[in-house]
Amino acid sequence: LEEPGKLERVLHLLALYSETPALDELSYPVREWIDRLKGPRETDGAFIVRRTRALEAGPRLRESLYEDLDLWLRLAPGPGTPSRTHAHVPRGPAVFQAGPLRTGRPDLCAEVQRPPLGVETLSRREGQRIIDLARGSMVTRSRDLDAFAYGDPEDVRIFDCGDRLELAAIGMIPERRLLLEAVYGFLTLKNGVPIGYVLNSALFGSAEMAYNVFETFRGAEAAHIYGRVMATVRALFGADSFTIYPYQLGGDGNDEGLQSGAWWFYQKLGFRARNPQTLRLMRSELRRMKTNPGHRSSIPTLRQLAEENVYLHCERERDDVIGLLPFENVGMAITSSLARRFGSDRSRGEGALAREAAERLGVDVGRG
């Protein structure tokens, strides 16, 4: 507990009302209170999670309260604990590497024209199995992804990219989907073993992609796999324009991205910034590399380069793409309309505006 006061302030919510006389009068440290409240065979972390889940509140409120506690949880080894070693889904015979690794840089716009070899829509049971595998793959690396945390077991597909390279596309449960973009998480599998993940948002034939290879599997066929990811995204959403946001490039405090030279990885695959200052800095660095082949961009330079989105247009360059569309204007327009017409009565306003939108779009609200 880095800030025990946060847990102490909500302790009464985790206990029963009949326990409050002791909580009010006795000043035990919060850790001692948790030890007294939990069961003899129950861990402190399990107690807090279970009691938070039992609160008489909506899921978003419970989630917000729990996140505000800022707890660090330790996974104890055991038969039911997620494991990197045993993370695997059996989906056919293994394909062994019989030739050199594909370490070159593919022509991404040519790659997107080669669709996956096949796609399989999973049953709810198999979909949940893949979601559980994705969650375990993340938590054992101290990572998290909403698309996996709120994955919909009825919206899971496996894309066959050849040589037992597969992408498990996981959609989100309806109540967690974004208002405008279609968001999917992809678990990257090689011979059934998770080797990375992708987060993709799609709208208007454009896609914003966050591509990650787990550290164990880096330095191999990253560019080749990236091309297969783009081809899958095109097959799913018809995307012809792709963007990478600053965090993936090493911006917004992503020191790991800076150290790995992520910005140049995408630059060499054809992505370009639109910001003139960023383009000038890129050209300056390229000139220095030409003069001195051993030159490497400094961390401060990479941090400057990573301040802006980069884009790749496989057809015509256009502005109606993710990264350039002002989504915030949509939210502000909705807020203004709700405030002007309904004020605090947001529930009534939501229903009224939904009916008006459905009427304009010719949608039968009764059928959703």
Regions found by a protein language model. Give the residues of each.
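Long, charge-dense tracts
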Residues: 2-139
